[in-house]
Design a protein with these regions (language model features):
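Conserved NAD(P)H cofactor-binding loop of Rossmann-fold oxidoreductase domains
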Residues: 5-10
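Active-site loop immediately N-terminal to the catalytic Tyr-X3-Lys motif
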Residues: 15, 62-66
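Residue(s) in the substrate-gating loop at a strand-loop-helix junction
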Residues: 55
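C-terminal helical subdomain
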Residues: 95, 115-152
Length: 174
């Protein structure tokens, strides 16, 4: 089993962000994950699994964390595509798209100015337990909690601009 759980984010106006940090975030969240998936395939066999850590940010464009959201959308899309490609070999691919998780990520990201509203914090153990349940069921996406499921449904129904307006209003950004 391969678990790609590393991730980082840069929060704040894109134009004001440190370019090296933006590129490092995109590199870790997207390219490093891609490399790990590819490098592990020769060692995978029927019954193997790949679990990629996405985010609830994967479902929509997220102003003031543009690169993070875009990189997590990439992870979701790649996971779904690989899942389809690797199914004939008996290799299962799942993307975990949790809400907010209490980890060191929050201290490193320095996001307090741009993330003010969080409907629920989840513990890493909760996310892992849900992911393992969903992996047993061979789900392609693991979503923990009602708030995230509700968000995913709404994002699919509402126009993109409306979704971004709601996000910015919740965070008190615009």
């Amino acid at each position: 089993m391969l678990v790609n759980a590393a991730g980082c984010g840069v929060f704040g106006p894109f134009a004001e962000a440190d370019r090296k940090k933006l590129l490092a975030s995109a590199q870790l969240n997207s390219l490093a994950l891609t490399g790990m998936c590819h490098a592990s395939l020769p060692y995978m066999h029927t019954g193997s699994s790949i679990i990629n850590m996405g985010s609830n940010s994967a479902w929509q464009p997220v102003p003031y964390q543009a690169v993070y959201g875009a990189s997590k959308s990439y992870v979701l899309s790649l996971s779904r595509a690989l899942g389809r490609e690797l199914r004939p070999q008996g290799i299962h691919v799942m993307c975990v798209c949790p809400g907010w998780i209490k980890t060191e990520f929050q201290q490193v990201a320095h996001h307090d100015e741009y993330i003010r509203y969080v409907d629920k914090w989840y513990g890493p153990d909760e996310v892992a337990a849900q992911a393992m349940q969903d992996l047993k069921k061979k789900k392609s996406v693991s979503i923990l909690g009602h708030p995230v499921r509700r968000q995913v449904r709404l994002v699919k129904l509402l126009p993109v601009d409306t979704v971004m307006d709601i996000w910015c209003k919740q965070q008190g950004i615009e």
